[in-house]
Amino acid sequence: MKPGIHPDYREVVFQDMSNGFKFITRSTIQTRETIEHEGKTYPLAKIEVSSESHSFYTGQQKIMDTAGRVEKFKNKFGARANGKAAAK
């Protein structure tokens, strides 16, 4: 392997932001934050979903608020969206 061209492969703590679950694995991800875990400092990568919170693995469903998304879009961008569509 050529020196200096490969990313740093190191232990990183991934934290599930939906439930606070943390796990250590090896990764090349670049992060600015660090965390103290078991007396050692590791880079911290924050993630939205992990196997601890995903409905496929937990067997529980989370209800997402998707109702009214089209209406919100129309209220926010209605005039501009209609104007651009007509101009084409």
UniProtKB/Swiss-Prot annotation:
Belongs to the bacterial ribosomal protein bL31 family. Type B subfamily. NCBIfam families: L31, PRK01678.1. InterPro entries: Ribosomal_bL28/bL31-like_sf (IPR034704), Ribosomal_bL31 (IPR002150), Ribosomal_bL31_B (IPR027493), Ribosomal_bL31_sf (IPR042105). GO terms for biological process: translation. The gene is rpmE2. The lineage of its organism: Bacteria, Pseudomonadati, Pseudomonadota, Betaproteobacteria, Burkholderiales. SUPFAM superfamilies: L28p-like. GO terms for cellular component: ribonucleoprotein complex; ribosome. PANTHER family: 50S RIBOSOMAL PROTEIN L31, CHLOROPLASTIC (PTHR33280), LARGE RIBOSOMAL SUBUNIT PROTEIN BL31C (PTHR33280:SF1). Keywords: Ribonucleoprotein, Ribosomal protein. It comes from Burkholderia cenocepacia (strain HI2424). It comes from the Bacteria. This is Large ribosomal subunit protein bL31B. Part of the 50S ribosomal subunit. GO terms for molecular function: structural constituent of ribosome.
